[in-house]
UniProtKB/Swiss-Prot annotation:
Protein name: Ribonuclease pancreatic
Lineage summary: Eukaryota, Metazoa, Chordata, Craniata, Vertebrata
InterPro entries hit by this protein: RNaseA, RNaseA-like_dom_sf, RNaseA_AS, RNaseA_domain
Molecular function (Gene Ontology), one example: RNA nuclease activity
Organism (species): Pan troglodytes
Tissues where this protein is expressed: Pancreas and other tissues and body fluids (indicating it may have other physiological functions besides its role in digestion).
Localization annotation: Secreted
Amino acid sequence: MALEKSLVLLPLLVLILLVLGWVQPSLGKESRAKKFQRQHVDSDSSPSSSSTYCNQMMRRRNMTQGRCKPVNTFVHEPLVDVQNVCFQEKVTCKNGQGNCYKSNSSMRITDCRLTNGSRYPNCAYRTSPKERHIIVACEGSPYVPVHFDASVEDST
């Protein structure tokens, strides 16, 4: 009797373990939309000419762990305004994909570029505040930015 119960419960246990193994890795994984927000949206501050802004933000936003991310752009606009770019002018992405959008108006941004000779773990960045149109790749439901593609000057 005990053996029969074990044989019935064994497949159920195997099924539960398979489901947990499949679901668990995605539980702690950051979504592409959340990663975009972490890496590119800084609504709480305005563009800073402080030479330490990029050094601090790149560390704070975990972009200097294991390597120095060479280039990054922070957008200093409300998150909803950045998300709304997904419904503005459709443009072709740098990689040829068709899911990029250009902001209708220029936005306040800060470009961070790794300085020449800077090596991990001592990542040092040059800070450049600007006002430019942003181009982002969007996907998902809701349709939101998942990749910062470029910034461009006003063409007027």
